[in-house]
């Protein structure tokens, strides 16, 4: 089980990222617009830098929904490989069966 503080920190990053997503997109589209003058684009870069770091979507960590484990998380299920193997072994994941040949 992961530390509760790291799970909470990741949740707050998700919330900040969602709330400032549109503002970041608008600033980035203006920054990459070649029709705007260089000085104005530089001021837009500075305003983007003033936004909180945790509002960036790249700072969000993919974590297991059950344990909070940060590594080995499958995108399809949102569960770490260990828990996924355990649940599949018990037959609790619909549509997935353990293969044998």
From Swiss-Prot:
Basic residues composition-biased segments: 11-22
Pfam families per record: Ribosomal_S14 (PF00253)
A GO BP entry: translation
The entry's keywords: Ribonucleoprotein, Ribosomal protein, RNA-binding, rRNA-binding
Gene Ontology annotations for the cellular component aspect, listed alphabetically: cytoplasm; small ribosomal subunit
Membrane spanning stretches: none
Quaternary structure and partners: Part of the 30S ribosomal subunit. Contacts proteins S3 and S10.
Family: Belongs to the universal ribosomal protein uS14 family.
PANTHER family: 30S RIBOSOMAL PROTEIN S14, SMALL RIBOSOMAL SUBUNIT PROTEIN US14M
Name of protein: Small ribosomal subunit protein uS14
Organismal lineage: Bacteria, Pseudomonadati, Pseudomonadota, Alphaproteobacteria, Rickettsiales
Protein encoded by which gene: rpsN
């Amino acid at each position: 089980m992961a530390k509760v503080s790291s799970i909470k920190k990741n949740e707050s990053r998700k919330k900040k990222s969602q709330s400032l997503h549109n503002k970041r997109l608008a600033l980035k589209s203006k920054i990459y617009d070649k029709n705007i003058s260089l000085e104005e684009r530089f001021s837009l870069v500075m305003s983007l830098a003033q936004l909180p770091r945790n509002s960036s979507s790249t700072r969000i960590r993919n974590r297991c929904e059950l344990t909070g484990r940060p590594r080995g998380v499958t995108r399809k299920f949102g569960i770490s490989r260990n828990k996924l193997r355990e649940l599949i072994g018990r037959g609790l994941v619909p549509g997935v069966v353990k293969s044998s040949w």
